[in-house]
A protein has these predicted regions:
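NTP-dependent nucleotidyl-transfer catalytic core
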Residues: 1-194, 199-202, 209-214, 227, ...
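Conserved nucleotide- and phosphate/pyrophosphate-binding catalytic cores
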Residues: 205-412
């Protein structure tokens, strides 16, 4: 097997391929241009979107050329793959704004140089396309009977599938054809939920040009408990630091299950496999800390990773920079005569209700790091917190349970 494909397989980026032997032979002979697509249906990429883009970087490092295709056109419809109901239709203006955000995030992660990594947008050929011409030229190449055999459609037949969504496969297939014409792209990679769309695109190119192209998919990434990877209590793990603060991003990786650490090292870092295996022979908590730092550094940069690490250490009662932690300002007047811990955890937002805050304290899940720099457990629901409990920076660190932290900053 080709070296680049071995790397993908070794690191967990391989589920199935349309013709692994043919693709391997081609990649041995020449530099292959391939593409990854993503639709800007939200204001930020999340970590689930990034799996194929990590693969893109691995393939680029072995001499191949990757195209990141932003679906400024297909986002106007919405891909039904992996969805149980129709996506909300969003305005063209919102899509265009999302495109700009996606492009900035991907450029930061990939670095588009026009040679080894390219950026394209299917809005350029889809937005003003003539419907009649498209259906005559492209629609005639598709069999409805065959389309209905793909899982992405079969799963939706019982719950309802609009014609708008049903036509999505034609558009994604057309993307592959256009990229083949524009850039000699001969490989599409993506999650395994895209298998039907990828195969359809390869078939379309064969019908139109007589040439063979390839498709390769990755497993859908799940945690060891079977749940979808990259989900938090607050939703998806976004790349936008406003939507997911860097500290929270870091803490997600720091708190993954032991059984997931090696898998996530392989998928979401660029450390050599031998180095990962060496890390895994040591203390598991140190391995998780390293994982959190590495992934945060890849996505947000080394400086932000350092700040998040320092904030995590400070949150556990050690010394360190707390500036990266989720922060809330609170007026000093709230502490005149003292403020009860139940009210404090409720006002901070760490507990949704006062009853929840009371249970948190009673069950031993409430912690404070104050003026002595040491974290302590709150055991008395009647305890009062005063202004003097804040440290000399005017900070008080709260923790609810194992994973929720907040830095309170006193405003005079």
């Amino acid at each position: 097997m080709n070296k680049a494909l071995k790397t993908l397989k070794e690191r967990g980026f391989f589920q199935q391929c349309t013709d692994i032997d043919g693709l391997s032979d081609l990649m041995d002979k020449e530099s292959v241009t391939f593409y990854v697509g993503t639709d800007p249906t939200g204001p930020s990429l999340h970590i689930g979107h990034m799996v194929p883009f990590f693969a893109l970087r691995h393939l680029r490092e072995t001499g191949h050329c990757g195209i990141a295709l932003i679906g400024g056109g297909t986002a106007r419809i919405g891909d039904p793959s992996g969805k149980t109901e129709m996506r909300k239709i969003i305005s063209y203006e919102e899509i265009d704004e999302n495109v700009k955000r996606f492009e900035n995030q991907l450029n930061k992660f990939i670095g588009f140089d026009g040679k080894t990594a390219l950026l394209d947008n299917n809005k350029y050929w889809l937005a003003d396309m003539n419907y009649i011409d498209f259906m005559r030229d492209i629609g005639s190449c598709f069999s409805v009977n065959r389309m209905l055999t793909f899982e992405s459609y079969k799963k939706r037949m019982e719950t309802g599938l609009s014609f708008l969504e049903f036509s999505y496969q034609l558009l994604q297939s057309y993307d592959f054809l256009k990229l083949h014409e524009r850039h000699n792209c001969c490989l599409q990679i993506g999650g395994d939920d895209q298998w039907g769309n990828i195969v359809a695109g390869a078939d379309l190119i064969r019908r139109k040009t007589g040439k063979q192209v390839y498709g390769l998919t990755f497993p859908l990434i799940t945690r060891s408990d079977g749940k979808k990877m990259g989900k938090t209590e607050k939703g998806a793990l976004f790349l936008d630091p406003v939507m997911t603060p860097v500290f929270d991003f870091f803490q997600y990786w720091r708190n993954v299950a032991d059984a997931d650490v090696r898998k996530f090292f392989l998928l979401f870092t660029f450390l050599p496999v031998a180095e990962i295996d060496e890390i895994m022979t040591g203390d598991i908590n140190k391995a998780k800390e390293r994982l959190a730092w590495e992934v945060t550094a890849v996505i947000h940069g080394k400086d932000e990773a350092d700040k998040a690490l320092a904030g995590a250490k400070a949150a556990f009662g050690g010394s360190g920079d707390t500036s990266s932690m989720p922060t809330k300002e609170i007026a000093s007047g709230e502490f005149q005569g003292g403020l009860g811990v139940v009210d404090l955890f409720f006002m901070s937002g760490l507990s949704a209700t006062k009853s929840e805050a009371r249970r948190l304290v009673q069950q031993g899940g409430a912690y404070i790091t104050g003026n002595d720099g040491k974290e302590r457990q709150i055991t008395d629901i009647a305890e009062i917190v005063e202004e003097k409990d804040f440290n000399d920076k005017g900070e008080l660190i709260l923790r609810a349970g194992k994973k929720k932290y907040l830095r309170l900053v006193l405003q005079k």
